[in-house]
Amino acid sequence: MPRVPSQTPPAPPARWLAGRLAVVTGASRGIGAATAVAVAAAGAHVVLAARDGQALDGVAGRIKDAGGQATPLATDVSDEAAVERLFAEAGGMGRLSALVCAAAVLTPAPFAETTPAMWRETLEVNLTGAFLCCRAAFTAMVRAGEGRMVNIASLSGVYATEKFPGLAAYNVSKYGVIGLTEAIAVEGKEHGISAVCLSPGAVDTEMLRRANPALRPGLTPDDVAALIVALLDSPLAPASGANIPLFSNA
C-alpha cells in the first residue's frame, strides 16, 4: 500500500503590522488606547501620542507587560511644532508604516451657547490635529514608498444620519475628517499610501459618558480597535478614501 505523505498545514500569512512602526494618537484612553494595545499585539512598535502623559505611560506599560513595544510621547496634536517633534522622534525609531488618528474632544453645548473658544478647540484638536498628523505621516510614507492610515470620524459626521443636539462643533469637525481622508486617498495613490475613515456610532468611552450619561452605547473601544487592526492588516488600496459607518444601535 503506497505511503501517503503527511501534509503539514500551511503557515498563516504574516501579519502586515508585524515588525512595523505605527503612530496612534489619542492613545491615552478610549478608542485610541484600545487601538494602541491591539496594534502592539499584532506585532507593531507603537508610538502613543496624547496630551495626558501620565495616562499614556499607563497604556504603554500595559503593552510592555504583555510583551509588546511601545513608546509614549506626550503631544498636543493641535500644536504644529509638537506634531513635528512627534514624527521626528518616531522617524528615529524606524520607517513609519501606519497612522491611526483617534485624538478628539467633545464639549456639548446648545448651538446658540457655543462660544468661539469652544468651536476653535474642537476644530483644532479633531480636524486640524488630524490634518497635522496625516500631513507629517504622509511625508514620511512618501519617502518609504507605502503607508496606511485610519482616521476616526463619527456617525455625527455622516450625511443624513440622525444627529444629537448640542454637537455643532463636533459634527463639523467629523465631517471634515471624512473629507480629509478622501483627499489623502487621492494624493496618496501614486505613492502607495492608502487612507480609510471609520465613523462609529455611540462607543462606550469616558468622553461619551461625560457628554451623555443616559446613552447606552452598543460598541466598545475594543470593538473599534479590532476593526482598525483588521483594516491595517489588509490591503487598503481598493478601499482607500472610503468612510465606513459603524452603527451601534445605541
Residue spans for each PLM region:
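C-terminal helical subdomain
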Residues: 190-193, 197-198, 213-250
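Substrate-binding pocket helix/loop in short-chain dehydrogenase/reductase
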Residues: 110-111, 118-123
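Active-site-adjacent segment of SDR/Rossmann-fold oxidoreductases
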Residues: 162, 183-193
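Conserved NAD(P)H cofactor-binding loop of Rossmann-fold oxidoreductase domains
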Residues: 102-108
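Residue(s) in the substrate-gating loop at a strand-loop-helix junction
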Residues: 154
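Conserved glycine-rich cofactor-binding loop
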Residues: 21, 28-29
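Active-site helix of classical SDR
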Residues: 134, 170-173, 181
